């Protein structure tokens, strides 16, 4: 694909590494390439889970490439399919993505991690949205996703002052799933990915679809929507071969063999 992105398939698991000097910052060209990778992941029936990480041990990603900005790349430039970093605006991705945060996740790098379904981070990781100090706004998800995760006082401080949050604080607030040593990071992310592979793919797709559609609804309204037939994956799960295989495998005390149908 490019010198900035490396990806490896391990069976149903896709590992993507952003490796771009300096600080794994992302310009429009790199963002386009990342979007193509994530769309290919979405559309490949053999792939079940993606892991995105950064090259090196210091930066997951510093976000938007300020050198490109200084050379004329506009904040509202076309960053390609999936929005900034290829993931922040994909709203029909029904497969899980794990962000393995290996260091600083600043600005758009933090927004990329927030767009993932799970965050596993190294104990040296830290998170920040410093855009206001640069005269811009974290509009690739930071200003939208962070308020769903944190109390207003913390959100305001992070958005308006750019203050950093370390890995342990992020764990306490529930922003990240796991904090591990730098050396154990990828093993931990791969372990989580394998746990996800062990779950039925249609069920995972339905869960993501339901959550995406109903997360802002009152519970009663959410129930009505689920039963309305408007969803794509949920009805398919109910009448799938996997819905038969799961209980049957449990009764027979064996691992299920998922077919994704």
From Swiss-Prot:
| EC number from the UniProt entry | 4.2.1.149
Question: Quick one: which pathway?
Answer: Amine and polyamine metabolism; carnitine metabolism
| One GO BP | carnitine metabolic process
Please list the residues that make up the active site.
111 (nucleophile), 131 (proton acceptor)
Tell me yes or no: is RNA-binding among this UniProt entry's keywords. Answer: no
Which stretches are annotated as coiled coil?
Answer: none
The UniProt entry, under Pfam families, shows: ECH_1
Keyword list, A-Z: Lyase
Q: Which GO terms describe its molecular function?
A: hydro-lyase activity; L-carnitine CoA-transferase activity
Please list the reactions this protein catalyses: (R)-carnitinyl-CoA = crotonobetainyl-CoA + H2O
Q: Which PANTHER family match?
A: ENOYL-COA HYDRATASE, MITOCHONDRIAL, ENOYL-COA HYDRATASE-RELATED
Q: Tell me, what does this protein do in biology?
A: Catalyzes the reversible dehydration of L-carnitinyl-CoA to crotonobetainyl-CoA.
Describe the family membership recorded for this protein in Swiss-Prot or TrEMBL.
Answer: Belongs to the enoyl-CoA hydratase/isomerase family.
Q: Which HAMAP family match?
A: CaiD
Q: This protein is called what?
A: Carnitinyl-CoA dehydratase
Q: What organism is this sequence from?
A: Citrobacter koseri (strain ATCC BAA-895 / CDC 4225-83 / SGSC4696)
């Amino acid at each position: 694909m490019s010198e900035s992105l490396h990806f490896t398939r391990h069976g149903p698991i896709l590992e993507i590494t952003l490796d771009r000097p300096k600080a794994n910052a992302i310009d429009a060209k790199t963002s386009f390439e990342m979007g193509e990778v994530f769309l290919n992941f979405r559309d490949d029936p053999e792939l079940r889970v993606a892991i995105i990480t950064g090259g090196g041990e210091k930066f997951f990603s510093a976000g938007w490439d300020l050198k490109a900005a200084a050379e004329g790349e506009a904040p509202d430039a076309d960053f390609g399919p999936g929005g900034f970093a290829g993931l922040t605006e994909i709203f029909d991705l029904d497969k899980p993505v794990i962000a393995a945060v290996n260091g600083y996740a600043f600005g758009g790098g933090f927004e990329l991690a927030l767009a993932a379904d799970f965050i596993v981070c190294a104990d040296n990781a830290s998170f920040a949205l410093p855009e206001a100090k640069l005269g811009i706004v974290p509009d690739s998800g930071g200003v939208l996703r962070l308020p769903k995760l944190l109390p207003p006082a913390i959100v305001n401080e992070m958005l308006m002052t750019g203050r950093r949050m370390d890995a342990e604080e992020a764990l306490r607030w529930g922003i990240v799933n796991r904090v591990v040593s730098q050396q154990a990071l990828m093993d931990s992310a791969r372990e989580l990915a394998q746990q996800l592979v062990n779950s039925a793919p249609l069920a995972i797709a339905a869960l993501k679809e339901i959550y995406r559609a109903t997360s802002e609804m009152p519970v009663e309204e959410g129930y009505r929507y689920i039963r309305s037939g408007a969803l794509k994956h949920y009805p398919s799960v109910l009448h799938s071969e996997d819905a038969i295989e799961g209980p049957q495998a449990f009764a027979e005390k064996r691992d299920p063999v998922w077919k994704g149908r």
